[in-house]
Every structure is written in structure tokens, then in C-alpha cells.
Amino acid sequence: MVKESAHFAFYSDEAISEADLNLAVQTLENTVWENLFNSNLLMPEPFFNTADKFKPSIHIHSTDGLSAGGWASNRVGMWIGPGALKDHWGLTHEFTHAWQYWWGFNGGLGCPDANTCGWIAESHANYTPHQLPEYRSEVHCSEMLGNAPHLYLGSSRDRYCNWQFMEYLKDKQCPSAVNQIFTTAGPDPFTNLQKSRGWTLSQLNDFFGDWAMHNVVWDYKSTPEGFRSAYGNITQTDRAERMRRLMPLEALDASWATNRRFVSPYFGSPQRFGYNVVRLYPASGASTVTVKFRGVDQPGSDADFRWGLVATNSQFSSARYSALQRGLDANLTFRVNAGEPLFLVVTATPSVFKTIVADQAYGSIWRYRYMVELANAWPQGFQNGQRDACASGTVRHANGGGCAPTSTPASVFVGPYATILPGGNASGTARIEDQAIIANGSVTGGTVGGLSIIGETGSPWGNHAFNVSGSAQVRTTFYPLGFFEANQAASGTLNLYGDVEYRGAGLNLGAGSRSGFVDSTSQVSSPTDINSTARPAWRP
């Protein structure tokens, strides 16, 4: 041991300067410990309820980076390099892991081998540094949740980046409500939240439905401007990864212009505690809008929903809310004012809790489709009772009816809801289906569908093109292919399906079915999907 403070013991097998040791003490005592335990979050200290107290061990070594955890029920600590002693965010994040580890061995949240809660360890460890005054406007990677809200909450794809619900829980309840997710015994953070709050499952579902509605303008008590400034507003599509903030509906049948009935997309319908935000356009002069909602209950899915309408100001900085709606069938009439943007928010809240484990196969997770019938309003894509005009530089393509540049060959199929933007192109017998967007790259063969976005645009980190060739099948639902690294492609007989995170510079896979985290070492998976492709039928 080379130094000791009120709450920490410092160790090193190297010569550490007194200045560096004093910096370590100052940071860990006055920033980390103070904000986690003495004020702000008021988390219960490790060993607070034990007769024997052990100071966390801080191991400093030049080859260490920044990590934390423990090695016994009464031993927690951190392993850090000298350069990390100035990193307040990193130290808070990692010491949060040490705290989580202690609770896992002392009656709190514990992850089974199936791993139902590994994601929240990282998400919570990004939530805690955001509470430090110096980081109140630092949102880190949390934009991911708002860019792909249809994925289940707790997805492995954004496991560091989905902590906004903890911020809202802190607002609505108190900081201890977040702490109790970890201090309550149980294997799943959501059931721990329910248990610690004394809620029924219906009340837990209410919380997530209410939270989703407030995410339209990030209507939180604490630092909402930080979220709004970093994310931009919900309608922004200036970057390819922001093109799925709003979920466009599809016509339920050919009579949509008269019956005004629409359905959520097969791939875009929300998973458990995921949500859709749908832009609605009130008819000119309308004083109210009516929504008839009909949820789709697939056998075994235990479908249930929370939904409502949200009207915002033109700056997307304040909102009015309808009452939260529940169940498979409900009708809502809501007052509207001229000039107010209007949104339908639908959250998947199954009536029987659905456990999802880390990296669970995409096709084994329920997606909760729903239908709506509208009065005095049209959804995005169908304004004023007709299909919306195509984006600049594109027109309706004769083969399929979607939007594409005029140079697109007639042999290319572009489905009615698909788009080829001017930065992308397709040729040969390529098929662009469903809600797919070709933003930056080429498709010379195969099929691109689902919610796939091909190529990155508008990015400060590089606008990477992505290419699809051969007979590849690409139907993805997460971030744009090409977002993470450059020079990537899908070729041959490759089948990319669902929540794909395609990783590795120059990656070009040519065979097998893959979903989830996909790199050069990924195992081939099954594309089987439990969700029915049958078009739902309206019910009165």
C-alpha cells in the first residue's frame, strides 16, 4: 500500500509520485465518492450494513487502463493507469462497476449465466457520471436509443447508451429508485424495478409508456437542453443513423384513402419496452384528432400496449400530452392547435413479462404490431390523403412505386415504401423492399429490405459507403450498414437479418445467416422468425 484516504487504499508495485497519488485521492474522494454516496445520487455505500468495513483497493500500474469490479464478496477495487487519474467520467463509470459488483454478492441484482442484466451494468455506469455537474450536458453515446427506439429496451446493440429511462425514473420517483434496481435481490433489472417500487406489471408498463411519450422532446426535469442540443429534434434526418427516429406506417389495405387505416411495419414494430414515434398531420382547420387503436396479439406474445398523442411547440422544446392509453383496443380524441407538430407514441408493454437475454437471437423476440384508424389526420407518408412527394432528386419508380433517382434502371424493383437517395444507386435485378433506404453505396444484386439503411451520410466521423452484390439478402433494423467502419460490403449468399451491428473495416461476408453483432468471427445463425408475416385484419 502506497497511500490511504478516508475511503480508499492505494496500491502500486511501481514508483508513483506523491502528486499523482494526491490527485487520485482528490478525484476519488471529492468527485466520485462525494457524488455517488454523500450527495447527488445518495447510493448506499459498499459495506454500509456489515460489521467489517473494507476500503476499496485502487491498483495503479503503468500498463493498466481503466477497469473495476471485485474478486470476492468483500473485495472490490479498480485497476487504473496513472493517466486515468484525471478522467472523472471514466473513474466514476468504473467505480460504479465496483459498487454493482459488491451488491451482486451482497443481496442485490445478480446476473445468471443467461445474462439478463449485463447490459444495465454498462448503461448505469454511464448514467452515474452524467450526474456529475461537469457532465450534465455530456450525453455520451445515448443518442443510439432515440435513433433506434423500436429495439427492446436493454438491447445488446446500445447497452452503454440506453440510460435515459433511469434519468426519467429519477425525475418521477427519486435517485434511490434507480439505486434500488441494484440493491434489490433478483436476476432482472425490470422485475427488480417493479419489485422495489411495489408496482404491478401494469404499473411498470405505465412507467415505460409515459417515459416514451416524454422522449419526443426529452421532457425531463434534469438537463433536457443537454439531450436536445446533442440529439437535435425528433424530425431530423441530417445523418443516416437518425432516419429511424420516426416510424412510418403502411397502408393496411388498398382502401386506405377512404378508411384511413394503417399498420406498423413488420420489421419496425416495437419489441418489449421499445417504442414507435409516428408523425401525424392534422387536417386543415381540424380542432380535434381521433385515433382508433387496435393492437395485434400473436399467439404467445401476450400483446399489450401503452400509447398516446403528443403535441409539441415548433421548437420541440415543450409538449402537451394525451392521457396514457392501455390495452389492445382503445379510442382517443385529442384537441389540436394550428402549427403544433403531432405525434403518436406506441410502446410495446406485454401483459406477461418477457425475459430477454444478452444477444438473444433477433427472430426469437416478439415484435408488437398495431393498427390505427384516423379521423382528421393523416400519418407521415400519406399527407392529405395521397402518398407524400419523393425526396429531392428522386421520383416514383415505375417498377414498385418507391422513390429513386430517374437514372435507376427499370429492372430494379423499388417497393412502395422503399427509397434510393441520390447518394445511392441500384442496378441489375436488385430489389429494394419494405422501408429500406439506400443512402450511400450501391446494390448490384440481391435484396435489401426491412429497416435497412445502406451507407452513412452526414456524419462527422466519415461518410462510409456500403455495397451489396450477388444474391445477398439484407434486412436489418439497427444502425446504417457502414456506420461503424469503412469499406464494407455484403455479397454472395449472405443473409443479414435484424439487429445487425456490422463490425470490422473492410468486412465483406459472403455466406451464412447473421444477426446481432456481426464480424469476421461471427457464427452462422438461423433466420427463423417467430413473428407472423400475415397482414393483420381490422376489427371494429
Predicted regions span which residues?
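Extracytoplasmic/secreted proteins, especially bacterial periplasmic and envelope-associated proteins
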Residues: 23, 27, 31, 86, ...
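Surface-exposed patches in mature extracellular/periplasmic domains of secreted proteins
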Residues: 37-59, 107-118, 137-143, 176-184
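Zinc-dependent metallopeptidase catalytic helix centered on the HExxH motif
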Residues: 73-141
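Beta/coil-rich, acidic/histidine-enriched accessory regions frequently appended to metallopeptidases
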Residues: 189-389
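Extended, small-residue-rich solenoid/repeat segments and analogous flexible loops
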Residues: 378-439
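Residues at the loop-to-beta-strand transition
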Residues: 412, 418, 424, 430, ...
